[in-house]
């Protein structure tokens, strides 16, 4: 874990059978789910660990419509830190990325510079 706050974006399919969205274990070693992981980053960054759903995105062209929910953890964060989860509803481990996926990620990165 870094000493200073950091902006974190996690993108995870809810139907991921390789790394389960809800968490599970690999060969007897437990790992946290997507929400718990992002909440841990939010806590590290001093953010309130209650996220806010702020909209939807179309990240997976193999799924109909704007299937992905954006949850942001930005309240009360220390400078230079935040956490965000893009949950791809019914998305698997390797989504069929939409044509504008790269643009969305680059916009996110540029919008969250390290101070």
Regions found by a protein language model. Give the residues of each.
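The feature captures the conserved acid-bearing segment of alpha/beta-hydrolase catalytic domains
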Residues: 1-64, 72-79
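Hydrophobic positions within alpha-helical membrane elements
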Residues: 21, 95-98
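Soluble or luminal CAZymes and related metallo-dependent hydrolases
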Residues: 33, 97-101
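Conserved beta-strand scaffold positions in the cores of enzyme catalytic domains, especially
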Residues: 70-72, 83-87
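Histidine-bearing beta->alpha loop at or near hydrolase active sites
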Residues: 89-94
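Catalytic active-site module of serine/aspartate enzymes centered on a nucleophile-bearing elbow/loop
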Residues: 100-115
């Amino acid at each position: 874990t870094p000493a200073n706050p950091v902006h974190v974006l996690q993108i995870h399919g809810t139907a991921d059978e390789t790394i389960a969205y809800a968490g599970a274990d690999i060969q007897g070693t437990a790992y946290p789910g997507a929400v718990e992981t992002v909440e841990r980053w939010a806590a590290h960054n001093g953010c309130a660990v209650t996220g806010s759903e702020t909209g939807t995105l179309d990240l997976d062209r193999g799924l109909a419509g704007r299937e992905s929910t954006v949850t942001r953890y930005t309240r009360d964060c220390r400078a230079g830190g935040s956490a965000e989860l893009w949950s791809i509803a019914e998305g698997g481990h390797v989504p069929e990325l939409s044509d504008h996926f790269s643009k969305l990620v680059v916009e996110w990165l540029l919008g969250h510079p390290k101070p």
